[in-house]
From Swiss-Prot:
Family statement drawn from the similarity comment of this UniProt entry: Belongs to the eukaryotic ATPase epsilon family.
Domain of life of the organism encoding this protein: Eukaryota
GO molecular function: proton-transporting ATP synthase activity, rotational mechanism
The protein's assembly and partners: F-type ATPases have 2 components, CF(1) - the catalytic core - and CF(0) - the membrane proton channel. CF(1) has five subunits: alpha(3), beta(3), gamma(1), delta(1), epsilon(1). CF(0) has three main subunits: a, b and c.
Miscellaneous section: Present with 4280 molecules/cell in log phase SD medium.
UniProt xrefs under CDD domains: F1-ATPase_epsilon
Protein name stated in the entry: ATP synthase subunit epsilon, mitochondrial
Organism: Saccharomyces cerevisiae (strain ATCC 204508 / S288c)
Phosphothreonine modified-residue sites: 52
Length: 62
């Protein structure tokens, strides 16, 4: 059985953890903004009324 299955996580979550570990292990001169920004996700939501968009997409913030 796979290690990620034994850990009880999905394959996508396993890949996310592995990618984050690789990015954090890079030498500091290779940790550029473009590399570190790959782990960020942008999410937007749109309100709908009667099947049409009632507003522009709004970013979800923490």
């Amino acid at each position: 059985m796979s290690a990620w299955r034994k850990a009880g996580i999905s394959y996508a979550a396993y890949l996310n953890v592995a990618a984050q570990a690789i990015r954090s292990s890079l030498k500091t001169e290779l940790q550029t903004a473009s590399v570190l920004n790959r782990s960020q996700t942008d999410a937007f939501y749109t309100q709908y009324k009667n099947g049409t968009a009632a507003s522009e997409p709004t970013p979800i913030t923490k």
